[in-house]
Amino acid sequence: MTEITNAIERTVEGTDLPKRLKDEVYESIEGRDVTDEQAVSIAEAVESRYLDTRVEPLDPVGTVSAQSIGEPGTQMTMNTFHYAGVAEIDVTQGLPRLIELVDARKTPDTPMMTVYLDDQHAENREKAHEVVWNIESTRILALGDVSTNVADMLVQVNLNEQTLDERMISAETVAEIIEDSLGVEVTQTGTTIEFGPAEPSYRRLLQLVEELREIVFKGIEEVSRVVIRKEDVDDGEEFILYTEGSAFGDVLDIEGVDASRTTCNNIHEVYRNLGVEAARETIIDETMNTLEEQGLGDVNIRHLMLVADIMTAEGTIESIGRHGISGNKNSVLARAAFEVTVNHLLDAAVHGEVDDLDGVTENVIVGKPIKLGTGDVNLRMGGATTDGSGRAD
């Protein structure tokens, strides 16, 4: 272990590193048995690498990012459903998932959440199951059998006592919920519940059965199923829940859930509950995970960060398409080059819009050098004064 001396601190604080990297340098030095000279060398080497990774002025980062994501994207599978390491849970992966993310779809094809538990519930299976039953929607067919008695015009429900105990719900509670939801008079005897239409009607009897099947007696309506798995983590093993369906805000309020680690693959739900910065992080993580699962994890994360920055720059989530970023550009020619060309040109002509030719696309269209790289550097010719202080008159 190395103690941080004044010399080391002066060197680290004198670098151009951001605070996060400085903290990591201190942590790395403290964790190693090194001399002051070696510690200074480490700090200087980190700064050198950091400066090397910075973008050159006028570098076309957008074009590079598009190519760096798009080219590996040609190797992605078209399979919509794929087991993403979780038994029995289908998750959209590959190209369809990447398209979902950049299109900023309101609802993913396969919404899901990864729910982490607090210390009290994470290591105890019974405690973890308590959280499962508070999340997974419990409907009547999970609690017992439903039958119809046409002669007496009654719907009969025979509840399973073991299931009621397991899911921690009483027969009385089930009867009350049925009465409130369907507006019928319910008779409950032990684990048997009976009710029927106010007026004898076979159609109404069948309708009551259909309505009964839709009632959620416990849990969150949007979450149809929860899978519980024991997984290895940094400090041992813990139970983690994977859900089919998502209701991010509701899950964060449930007792036993670790809200600081729980994630959701619906970026709009994250935005509504945690704000735009959390949504940006989710876009980056989901995109990176999608690429890694296809064996394309060597794509530099900064390209994905740029995409996420553009999508969230206005404080909301915008898609990359004609209804989002591409359709809202200031340049008429850039908008027209993307989609619905005639409509954009016609609207611009009607409103007398002017294109300042500031971007890449519009300059390519009119055959002018783009204002990036050497295209945005002006060379001024002139002689120097005799003392070298400036340009001669």
From Swiss-Prot:
It is found in: Cytoplasm. CDD domains: RNAP_A (cd06528). One of its GO terms (molecular function) is DNA-directed RNA polymerase activity. Its EC number is 2.7.7.6. It catalyses: RNA(n) + a ribonucleoside 5'-triphosphate = RNA(n+1) + diphosphate. Keywords: Cytoplasm, DNA-binding, DNA-directed RNA polymerase, Nucleotidyltransferase, Transcription, Transferase. One of its GO terms (biological process) is DNA-templated transcription. The keyword Chaperone does not apply. InterPro entries: DNA-dir_RpoC_beta_prime, RNA_pol_Rpb1_5, RPO1C. It comes from the Archaea. One of its GO terms (cellular component) is cytoplasm. Its main location: cytoplasm. Belongs to the RNA polymerase beta' chain family. Part of the RNA polymerase complex. HAMAP family: RNApol_arch_Rpo1C. DNA-dependent RNA polymerase (RNAP) catalyzes the transcription of DNA into RNA using the four ribonucleoside triphosphates as substrates. Forms part of the jaw domain. This is DNA-directed RNA polymerase subunit Rpo1C.
